[in-house]
């Protein structure tokens, strides 16, 4: 039988070339998918091996298995060998003590180098020489993704302070990582951006550099470093800027021992950064407008900031009034301490220039003078009660008579006074409350002398009135000018009464101040 094949339409060679190219793309896609599946399978196998090894290690040393030291210091073939080895072999491994408090891992001078290769090679077991603090070589570990994820998921819980770090203790940061410290992390204790924050979240233990790890044994060195930092900078410097400036100058964060952020103080021992700065000797914390805290040097604070700024060098930020370098103290009658005891007690707040306790049979008060006004402010910020030689001593700021007058004028000024009476002291006129007017009446009635306080719509009397305590002279009041008459006899004080303005000039002896 003969078969005849009819010639069909001729195929275009371009179609054959396109089909050949499509097959090539399909093969490449299958190869990529196969390699990704192989990579995923290898990672799952590696994670399973790590899980098996960790679970077996937990049975022997539960408290030391979470550190992941075996995983971090062993290569992947060693991990597979450990996972398949019997229990006797695991028990024969050297028992490792937990790392000291200053270190999270016993690794120093280690730098994580990530591989930025475009192809997929699976798990790469590259070895890195590790040197501990004693100079001895340690084994290396592979920088595989599975080990990091295994340590993060199994060994380090989320609430652990080491969570979110890789094996060498560095935080997982993006390519935009900066050396500037994060404001929220340093002052609030947390950052809402977490590991994606572009600023520095590090603390002292995670730097792993002896030149950067600097726990402050005392505040003296911190005081000296901050003083050197502030010298040459125009004052004042905001407290918020201080951590970043400190890190730029010294290359280490401002995190001394015992320091906690504001959010970490509840139920824990420590102090805030502002309270820490208040404990230093060569700098002062001042409060400016809008409640902002700034730091200045002591000499700058004495020159220009002590009078115009509120001194915040105390936790309760008490306002102690105007500047005065003396305090007035009262104490029990049976007190037996001497002037030297008083001086030695107040020397802890600042230099003392003198102590004066009047000699009396029953002494109950005294005066202490200081070289600087801020010393008085600091003493009063601690409270009014102090104990010298076991005896309770009450202190308050010493005020001159002129200051007492101005204080009383400020206290009676405003809307809480009665406008029916005015008291004139020198060239200052201030409104006095009706209570003071009542005291004037009682004082005059005790002396049993005539007194007239003239009211409006009454006949004006030009006669002079006398009392046993003081003399009263009538005067005219015309516009804004006051025409004053003075009368003085037998060393008596003087006072004047006015019909139109109801103004009375009262003597100092009435105790209005």
UniProtKB/Swiss-Prot annotation:
It comes from the Eukaryota. Residues 218-299 form the HTH OST-type domain. Keywords: DNA-binding, Metal-binding, RNA-binding, Zinc, Zinc-finger. Residues 325-411 form the RRM domain. The keyword Zinc applies. The keyword Zinc-finger applies. Residues 155-180 are annotated as: Disordered. One of its GO terms (molecular function) is RNA binding. A zinc finger (C3H1-type) spans 176-204. SUPFAM superfamilies: RNA-binding domain, RBD. This is Putative zinc finger CCCH domain-containing protein 51.
């Amino acid at each position: 039988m003969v078969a005849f094949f009819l010639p069909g339409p001729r195929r275009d060679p371009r179609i054959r070339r396109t089909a050949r190219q499509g097959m090539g793309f399909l093969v490449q896609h299958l190869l990529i998918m196969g390699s990704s599946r192989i990579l995923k399978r290898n990672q799952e196998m590696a994670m399973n091996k790590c899980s098996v090894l960790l679970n077996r290690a937990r049975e022997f040393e539960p408290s030391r298995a979470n550190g992941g030291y075996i995983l971090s210091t062993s290569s992947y073939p060693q991990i597979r060998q450990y996972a398949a080895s019997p229990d006797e072999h695991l028990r024969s491994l050297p028992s490792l003590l937990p790392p000291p408090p200053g270190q999270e891992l016993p690794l120093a001078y280690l730098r994580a180098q990530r591989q930025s290769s475009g192809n997929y090679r699976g798990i790469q077991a590259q070895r890195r020489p590790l040197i501990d603090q004693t100079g001895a070589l340690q084994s290396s570990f592979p920088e595989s993704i599975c080990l990091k994820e295994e340590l993060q998921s199994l060994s380090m819980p989320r609430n652990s302070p080491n969570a979110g770090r890789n094996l060498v203790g560095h935080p997982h940061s993006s390519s935009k990582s900066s050396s500037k410290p994060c404001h929220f992390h340093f002052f609030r204790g947390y950052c809402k951006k977490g590991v994606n924050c572009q600023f520095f979240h590090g603390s002292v233990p995670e730097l792993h550099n002896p030149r950067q790890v600097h726990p402050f044994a005392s505040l003296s060195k911190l005081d000296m470093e901050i003083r050197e930092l502030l010298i040459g900078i125009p004052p004042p410097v905001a407290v918020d800027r201080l951590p970043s400036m400190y890190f730029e100058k010294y290359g280490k964060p401002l995190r001394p021992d015992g320091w906690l952020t504001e959010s970490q103080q509840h139920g824990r021992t420590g102090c805030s950064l502002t309270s820490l700065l208040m404990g230093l000797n060569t700098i002062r914390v001042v409060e400016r407008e809008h409640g902002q805290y700034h730091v200045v040097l002591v000499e700058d604070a004495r020159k220009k900031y002590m009078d115009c700024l509120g001194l915040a060098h105390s936790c309760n930020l008490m306002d102690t009034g105007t500047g005065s370098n003396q305090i007035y103290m009262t104490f029990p009658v049976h007190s037996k301490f001497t002037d030297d005891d008083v001086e030695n007690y107040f020397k802890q707040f600042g230099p003392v220039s003198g102590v004066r306790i009047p000699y009396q049979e029953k002494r109950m008060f005294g005066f202490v003078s200081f070289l600087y006004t801020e010393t008085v402010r600091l003493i009063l910020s601690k409270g009014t009660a102090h104990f010298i030689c076991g005896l309770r001593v009450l202190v308050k700021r010493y005020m001159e008579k002129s200051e007492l007058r101005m204080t009383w004028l400020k206290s009676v000024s405003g809307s809480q006074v009665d406008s029916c009476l005015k008291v004139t002291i020198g060239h200052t006129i201030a409104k006095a409350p009706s209570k003071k007017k009542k005291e004037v009446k009682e004082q005059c009635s005790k002396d049993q002398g005539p007194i007239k306080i003239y009211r409006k719509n009454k006949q004006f009397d030009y006669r002079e009135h006398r009392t046993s305590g003081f003399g009263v002279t009538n005067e005219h009041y015309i516009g804004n000018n006051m025409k004053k008459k003075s009368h003085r006899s037998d060393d008596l004080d003087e006072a004047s009464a006015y019909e139109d303005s109801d103004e009375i000039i009262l003597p100092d002896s009435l105790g209005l101040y």
